[in-house]
Amino acid sequence: VEARDDEVIDNMQQALDRAVENGVKNLVVQPTHLMHGAEYDEMTEAINGYKDKFESVAIAEPMLGEVGDDATVINDDKKAVAQAITDTACKEAGFDSMDAAAEAGTAFVFMGHGTSHTANVTYDQMQTQMENLGLKNAFIGTVEGKPEDTACDKVIEKVKEAGYKNVVLRPLMVVAGDHALSLIHISEPTRHSLIS
């Protein structure tokens, strides 16, 4: 960012040091993480190392909220995200609703990064959330294929079994960098072969 935009952005330690130097007493941290995972754990560990320098420290949940123990655990955060991403995806694909897309034979696959962290159950929870909202043509996949049931080949099987002929790929990522670009810019023949 600095080289491109001539804008300096602190890393976490620099930001924490600056907060201490500036005399911050009550630190509130709003992470930009999608879910609990290795990066969220690293962030909380770093912040915990500074707790004695503040009167209070509060760390907010990531976008998808608490993890829970299994795929059935959903929450209001996951529901809000599921509704927002499906509403946006429908509109951008030219459909009035997910039901209208389903009637047209179109499924939406929302691709996350994937992780070997125990929080990977979050992806299965998002699939459960989609199903609980009645979104039968919404599927959750991961680039890394972790958890295994979110691997591309597994998601393709689910889409085929459900009878959808068209697929709209969407990132389920806060920062949609190289992974999202590689998904969205898959060539037409490759996209066709994934579903055929």
Positions of PLM-derived features:
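Glycine-rich, highly charged phosphate/nucleotide-binding loops
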Residues: 4-18, 154
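Hydrophobic, aromatic-enriched interface-forming segments
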Residues: 78, 82, 86-90, 99-127
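Short beta->alpha junction loops
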Residues: 1-5, 62-65, 140-148
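Binding-cleft/active-site segments that stabilize strongly anionic ligands or cofactors
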Residues: 137-183
